[in-house]
Design a protein with these regions (language model features):
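C-terminal cap of thioredoxin/glutaredoxin-like
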Residues: 9-10, 22-34, 112-214
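The canonical Cys-X-X-Cys-His
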Residues: 15-18, 185
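Glycine-/small-residue-rich active-site loops that bind phosphorylated ligands and cofactors
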Residues: 16-17, 102, 193
């Protein structure tokens, strides 16, 4: 008899720790599949808009972080820390290539459409493409034309995409993790892990959630 493991992931596209956490989760899931092939995993992605007050057209990336962290040196140290963690999971983040801090409401609404109409493969493709658009390609995640092209590249129906994009001026109802921030993982709706932890930590949390499944 198969067992079930639900994984709720709370994230934002502009958070590098969320991309790093996604990679760690993938490694943990592969180990779970190898050691526990009877477990059926159900992933649920929940968008958290960290900066809802960012202008719809976005703001300059460098200026945003200079103001947020107070100095060029503080920004450099923070980015170095992130790059080191990203490299450990084979993710290359070139902050010098990122020009815009976007408003992510439309991107999250697009993902909500994908969750409603897409397959698990399409959902993951869209997640990867949206992360890549921001961290690797310097594309504006608040631009509807960019989002249309991204969704089309993942195989979504053009009419469904256009209908979704036509409603993107509506407010985005962001998920809430309280003071836990993102990434935030909940396993089987009972065991939570906050932050971008190593894959082994996530794997052990999965095993514990399965043991306490009842």
């Amino acid at each position: 008899m198969s067992r079930h493991l639900t994984v709720d992931i709370f994230f934002d596209f502009i958070c590098p720790w969320c991309l790093i956490g996604k990679r760690q989760l993938q490694v943990a899931l592969l180990k779970l599949k190898e050691n526990n092939p009877d477990v059926e995993v159900i992933l649920s992605w929940h968008g958290v808009q960290l900066l809802p007050h960012i202008a719809a057209e976005g703001v300059p990336f460098d200026a945003f972080y200079q103001q947020r962290l107070g100095s060029h040196e503080a920004v450099r140290m923070r980015q170095s820390q992130v790059r080191q963690a990203a490299n450990a999971v084979d993710v290359d983040i070139d902050f010098s290539n990122i020009k815009l801090m976007p408003n992510t409401a439309k991107a999250h609404q697009l993902l909500a459409m994908a969750i409603q109409f897409g397959t698990a493969t399409q959902i993951d493709q869209l997640l990867e493409r949206l992360f890549s658009a921001y961290f690797h390609l310097s594309e504006d995640l608040g631009n509807s034309e960019n989002l249309l092209k991204i969704a089309q590249s993942c195989g979504f129906d053009t009419d469904v995409i256009n209908n979704t994009l036509g409603q993107l001026n509506q407010p985005f109802n962001s998920a809430n993790t309280g003071s836990n921030g993102v990434p935030y993982f909940i396993f089987n709706q009972r065991l939570a892990v906050a932050g971008a932890h190593p894959a082994e930590t996530l794997y052990n949390a999965m095993l514990e959630a399965l043991v306490t499944q009842g």
